[in-house]
Amino acid sequence: MKVHEKVSELIGNTPIIHLKKFGINVFAKCEFLNPSHSIKDRAAFEMIKDALDSKKINQDTTIVEATSGNTGISLAMICADLGLKFIAVMPESMSLERRKMITLFGARLELTPANLGMKGAVDKANEILLNTPNSFMVSQFENISNKNAHRKNTALEILRDLDNELDIFVAGFGTGGTISGVGEILKEKLEKVHIVGVEPLNSPLLSKGEAGSHKIQGIGANFIPAILNKEVIDEVITVSNEDAINTAKELAKSGLMVGISSGANVFAASMLAKKFPDKRILTMLNDTAERYLSTDLFA
């Protein structure tokens, strides 16, 4: 009998599905099947585990993080699983379903004015850190454990499940953890692999140096994260809000209930499939559509 004692033991080893409708050689890794239904479970667990192992935190530490969504939900789940206190700070403009998920896990939620954006949330998180004894900021955009979660696990799962046969890897980037961690290992193991980054058409920061507002939550953070390894990215494809949302809706018609950034990833992969029909392409299905009930995905 194989049973698990901790929710964190359920993270990873997500299956890969063949998306024939979007290209004969297009495949996707189903990260929405992680326990809190997003790829961020991987990084959240690794960041907390490494902090515990290195004695940066203990069972009495209060974890603090400024977050706009999935990372906050994943951290709330991990902290609940491990018996840690967690305070999430997010702009009040974030969706109601995100707020409710975080508090459902027992975390404390602090909202900041919408007009201050993520900077306002970061400033408030730093204030809480200063005023809370034995507290720790996760700092997902700078925390190398974020990237290492994908080096140690995600990338190796991909190589194992595809028998080391992959030509193109496609991923959006928010913190940069997934594309950097997976990309670094794939580059080490597969001589000719091509790594493609996906960013919003309305915020082509890496490809054109321009930042703007967009509707593809989870990618396009409007700044270059410290852990993003630009050296592993061979090409960047921009995807419009409409194409990302419409592709997510098409995925739903195939039975895959995924979010907007997953739509962006699959749209980019389908474009590459038309250009390179004989190449094996893998992308990521990052999270579940249920996280977007109040967005244009359900309009």
Swiss-Prot record:
Keywords: Amino-acid biosynthesis, Cysteine biosynthesis, Pyridoxal phosphate, Transferase
Cofactor dependency: pyridoxal 5'-phosphate
Enzyme class name: transferase
SUPFAM superfamilies, per database record: Tryptophan synthase beta subunit-like PLP-dependent enzymes
EC number: 2.5.1.47
Protein's pathway: Amino-acid biosynthesis; L-cysteine biosynthesis; L-cysteine from L-serine: step 2/2
Molecular-function GO term, any one: cysteine synthase activity
The reaction(s) this protein catalyses: O-acetyl-L-serine + hydrogen sulfide = L-cysteine + acetate
Modified residues (N6-(pyridoxal phosphate)lysine): K40
Residues involved in pyridoxal 5'-phosphate binding: N70, G174, T175, G176, G177, T178, S261
Superkingdom as given in the UniProt entry: Bacteria
Amino-acid biosynthesis among keywords: yes
Gene Ontology biological process terms in this record: cysteine biosynthetic process from serine
InterPro entries: Cys_synth, Cys_Synth/Cystath_Beta-Synth, CysK, P-phosphate_BS, Ser/Thr_deHydtase_PyrdxlP-BS, TrpB-like_PALP, TrpB-like_PALP_sf
Family: Belongs to the cysteine synthase/cystathionine beta-synthase family.
Name under which the protein is recorded: Cysteine synthase B
UniProt lineage: Bacteria, Pseudomonadati, Campylobacterota, Epsilonproteobacteria, Campylobacterales
Gene behind the chain: cysM
